[in-house]
């Protein structure tokens, strides 16, 4: 009888438990080809300067990008944007960054090494340094107005444009 009661109580406890649902919307959950942030969430100290990578995920034949990255200027100040290794060949990529107040525009172009005219694969496109101005949550978003082109200036289809959550305390 004791075994039956214990089994019954265990069964009731099993039914009463809820299975937690987690949001694992990270780099490898993106549907490639994609432009995503790595990591997608960062806890920071308010007033500090931090960095995040904007990465290409399985993009083939890329010769250039226009990236529109939106942010809230009440919470975030963009300090610096530096080209990553994705477009690097024997020549460093050409990157132009324009801050428009609520978004930045990043133009980055692959400079041919005489052998290939484009970059392929995954890697850091740019590293973004930002200052969290005050406590609270904010985001950096890659707008769907962003474009990726091949060597013939033909648009490449992107399946995912990522976001980055800043949790400043």
Mark where each language-model region is.
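Sec-dependent bacterial lipoprotein signal peptides
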Residues: 1-15
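Acidic, low-complexity intrinsically disordered segments
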Residues: 17-169
């Amino acid at each position: 009888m004791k075994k039956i009661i214990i089994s019954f109580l265990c069964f009731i406890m099993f039914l009463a438990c809820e299975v937690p649902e987690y949001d694992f919307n990270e780099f490898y959950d993106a549907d490639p080809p994609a432009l995503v942030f790595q990591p997608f969430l960062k806890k920071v100290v308010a007033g500090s300067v931090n960095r995040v990578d904007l990465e290409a995920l399985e993009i083939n034949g890329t010769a250039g990008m226009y990236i529109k990255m939106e942010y809230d200027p009440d919470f975030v100040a963009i300090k610096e944007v530096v080209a990553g290794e994705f477009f690097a060949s024997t020549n460093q990529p050409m990157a132009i960054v324009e801050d428009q107040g609520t978004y930045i525009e990043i133009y980055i172009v692959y400079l041919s090494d005489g052998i290939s005219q484009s970059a392929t694969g995954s890697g850091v496109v740019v590293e973004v340094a930002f200052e969290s101005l005050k406590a609270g949550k904010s985001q950096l978003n890659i707008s769907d107005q962003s474009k990726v082109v091949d060597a013939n200036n033909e648009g490449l289809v992107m399946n995912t444009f990522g976001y980055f959550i800043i949790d400043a305390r």
